[in-house]
């Protein structure tokens, strides 16, 4: 057997494989908000909180807080985090450069309070 394979690199087959639906993608993202370290990563490493499109997207995702969508949520704490993020970003305004201002403390608050919120979430689950 030679060191180099004559087979092409792995490429997913388009036959029979479907991309996730918008519903599935949005559900997965909303539920990922229950993971405080992930939220911290998003906010601090990517500075995504400064993007007005992110603010609009989070606001749009609030429909998950309403029936009938809540029945699909496995990690209900994600809705708490979604509302928390939106409450911070509601105060932010877009400057002339297209960057949100007024929510500069958001990453720091998530970093400092995130551990406590995770503990509170666990306690609610035990409750």
From Swiss-Prot:
Q: Identify the InterPro entries for this entry.
A: Med31_sf (IPR038089), Mediator_Med31 (IPR008831)
Give the superkingdom in one word. Eukaryota
Its Gene Ontology cellular component terms are: core mediator complex; mediator complex
Q: Does the keyword Nucleus apply?
A: yes
Signal sequence region: none
Q: Which GO terms describe its biological process?
A: DNA repair; meiotic gene conversion; positive regulation of transcription elongation by RNA polymerase II; positive regulation of transcription initiation by RNA polymerase II; regulation of transcription by RNA polymerase II; RNA polymerase II preinitiation complex assembly
Q: GO molecular function: any one?
A: transcription coactivator activity
Q: Where in the cell is it found?
A: Nucleus
Q: Does the keyword Transcription regulation apply?
A: yes
Q: Which UniProt keywords apply?
A: Activator, Nucleus, Transcription, Transcription regulation
Q: Which Pfam families match?
A: Med31
The primary location reported for this protein is nucleus
Q: Which family does it belong to?
A: Belongs to the Mediator complex subunit 31 family.
Q: How does it assemble?
A: Component of the Mediator complex.
Q: What does this protein do?
A: Component of the Mediator complex, a coactivator involved in the regulated transcription of nearly all RNA polymerase II-dependent genes. Mediator functions as a bridge to convey information from gene-specific regulatory proteins to the basal RNA polymerase II transcription machinery. Mediator is recruited to promoters by direct interactions with regulatory proteins and serves as a scaffold for the assembly of a functional preinitiation complex with RNA polymerase II and the general transcription factors.
Q: What is this protein called?
A: Mediator of RNA polymerase II transcription subunit 31
Query: Which taxonomic lineage is given here?
Result: Eukaryota, Fungi, Dikarya, Ascomycota, Saccharomycotina
Which gene name belongs to this protein? Answer: SOH1
């Amino acid at each position: 057997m030679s060191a180099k394979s004559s087979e092409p690199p792995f490429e997913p087959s388009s036959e029979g494989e479907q991309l996730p639906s918008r519903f599935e993608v949005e559900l997965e993202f909303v539920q990922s908000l229950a993971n405080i370290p992930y939220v911290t990563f998003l906010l601090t490493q990517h500075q995504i909180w400064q993007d007005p499109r992110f603010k609009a997207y989070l606001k749009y995702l609030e429909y998950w807080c309403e029936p009938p969508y809540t029945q699909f949520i496995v990690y209900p704490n994600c809705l708490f985090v979604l509302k928390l993020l939106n409450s911070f970003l509601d105060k932010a305004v877009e400057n002339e450069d297209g960057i949100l201002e007024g929510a500069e403390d958001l990453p720091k608050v998530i970093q400092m309070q995130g551990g406590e919120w995770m503990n509170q979430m666990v306690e609610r689950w035990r409750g």
